[in-house]
Swiss-Prot record:
Location relative to the cell: Cytoplasm
Similarity comment: Belongs to the ribonuclease III family.
Residue span, RNase III domain: 8-135
Catalytic activity: Endonucleolytic cleavage to 5'-phosphomonoester
Residues annotated as domain DRBM: 161-230
GO biological process assignments: mRNA processing; regulation of gene expression; rRNA processing; tRNA processing
Role description: Digests double-stranded RNA. Involved in the processing of primary rRNA transcript to yield the immediate precursors to the large and small rRNAs (23S and 16S). Processes some mRNAs, and tRNAs when they are encoded in the rRNA operon. Processes pre-crRNA and tracrRNA of type II CRISPR loci if present in the organism.
Protein's name in the database: Ribonuclease 3
Residues at which Mg(2+) binds: E48, D121, E124
InterPro entries (UniProt xref): dsRBD_dom (IPR014720), RNase_III (IPR011907), RNase_III_dom (IPR000999), RNase_III_sf (IPR036389)
Length: 238
């Protein structure tokens, strides 16, 4: 048994489920970068689409069961914390999916195996494969097992993110809301790098970088927040 076959076996052991359709499992674990150029390789992108919907269903029904009196807005906020690609990537690592992935040599070289975006997508594809091969109960069992820590994180006190802090600050100053603009987007699709510029009236502009647009916006907002102890609006440069 080679290293990857051992990793796939370990993945199934951790999940507690052995696939009947081995081709389906292989497709769920195959990144779009795989292919020799001579023929199409069935990869996991279509499965991601289905897996995202199954994941949202499992998370939504669990949230409703945990708090029957929760308002829709609060559940939507909690749902967003449970189904983003960072949460999916953490679940993928807990399951041992990282080493079981099929990646091209070039994708492996640039670190795709450690990419939250790649791992998150693969996790959604795996959920879809579990749903197809074993039904909703099998997919739900995976979710409950590997999202347990994510539910624990919901109870942790959370500091406001930089974008929220910046918005509250400018509103308190009576200024227009900050504006964000993508300055550049570089790198391959599985490992992009964004640069975003934020502007606040009277305080100029600041830039931030990140692996996603949202991360870059937060970085830019954090840089702008450092100007709060600077000159008042309209006095910049005086």
């Amino acid at each position: 048994m080679n290293a990857r076959a051992a990793a796939v076996a370990e993945l199934e052991r951790r999940i507690g489920y052995v696939f009947t359709d081995r081709d389906l499992l292989e497709r769920a674990l195959t990144h779009a970068s795989v292919g020799d150029g001579a023929r199409a390789v069935r990869h996991n992108e279509r499965l991601e689409f289905l897996g995202d919907r199954v994941l949202n269903l499992c998370a939504a029904e669990r949230l409703m069961a945990l708090d029957p009196d929760a308002r829709e807005g609060e559940m939507s906020r909690l749902l967003a914390s449970l189904v983003n690609y960072h949460a999916c990537a953490r679940a993928a690592k807990r399951a041992g999916l990282q080493e079981a992935l099929r990646l091209s040599a070039s994708a492996t070289k640039v670190g795709a195996r450690k990419s939250d975006a790649v791992l998150g997508d693969a996790c959604e594809a795996l959920i879809a494969a579990l749903y197809i091969d074993g039904g909703l109960e099998t997919a739900r069992a995976f979710f409950l097992k590997f999202w347990d820590e994510e539910f624990a994180r919901l109870d942790e006190p959370r500091a406001k993110d930089p974008k929220t802090q910046l918005q509250e600050w400018v509103q308190g100053m009576g200024l227009p809301l900050p504006t964000y603009e993508i300055v550049s987007q570089e790198g391959p699709p599985h490992a992009p790098s964004f640069t975003v510029e934020v502007q606040v009236a009277g305080f100029g502009a600041e830039r931030g970088e990140g692996r996603s647009r949202q991360a870059a916006e937060k970085a830019a907002a954090q840089c702008m927040l450092l100007k709060r102890e600077g000159p008042e609006p309209g006095k910049v440069g005086e």
